[in-house]
Amino acid sequence: MCIRDSKRGVPSVITRPPYAQTGDPGPSILPLVRTSDEIASMRKAGAIAAEVLLHVGENVTPGITTDKLDQIAHDEIVRLGAYPSPLNYRGFPKSVCTSVNEVVCHGIPDSRQLQDGDIINIDVTVYFEGVHGDTSVTFYVGEVDEHSKHLVQITREALYKGMDTVKNGSRVCDIGKAIEKHAHSNQLSVVREFIGHGVGPEFHSALAIPHYFDRRATTELTTGMSFTIEPMLNLGGNTLHMWDDTWTVVTTDGRRSAQFEHTLVVTEDGFEIMTKTSSGTIPSEYFAN
């Protein structure tokens, strides 16, 4: 049986998102296009999220618990003056999500020890200067099998295939089309129930980014829009099951799942990655192997 510790504290001097006390983010009501000041703050929030993900990733080793990884992330987030966005978002009890092997997303850190050969996605989001920065990487734990390496590598590539379609005037459906094509050509399935989303002053804003081709997703991307792309690909089928904790989502067939994520802002001729460190290091590339 895995044990979950209680929520971690955040110093009172750190600015909290509106939902921090109640857990209720309310409806998404803000514009999809960011101001120049908001984009400047998103660079800072994204840089913190990337720094934290790099720091946590260096601690992914056999024997460590996912709760310890959560503690490492939490301590680094607050040290850098930010708030861990998942904490109490709709009641989520931890500061990051840790999704191991067949867990697709929203795994809750607990006393589970990582084993040699596991894979783990760590999803870090921070709130800083009134905006969120959201990013994730799937890590190898020790030596993993070739099927898992294939899954992780193709999922990383699929993220970048989707990103490469982003520019002013392109359509949301172009992102999913590119991701789905790359996944299927490499014999992987695409999760449909969980998608990318608008992000900025709100953790999840109204813009929806499917990771599969959806001809209804005709929204035209406009300079200044900010959102995540975060494909989840599976070795087996794409049917899912949610645990009784109402957060943890797993593959129905028990096969492994991987995910990578960046926060982007649309530019006139492409995009800018928000979730890179102040020195330009991008976690999804730093840990590529």
Stretches found by the model and what they are:
Residues R4-N289:
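Active-site neighborhoods and metal-handling regions in enzymes and metal-associated proteins
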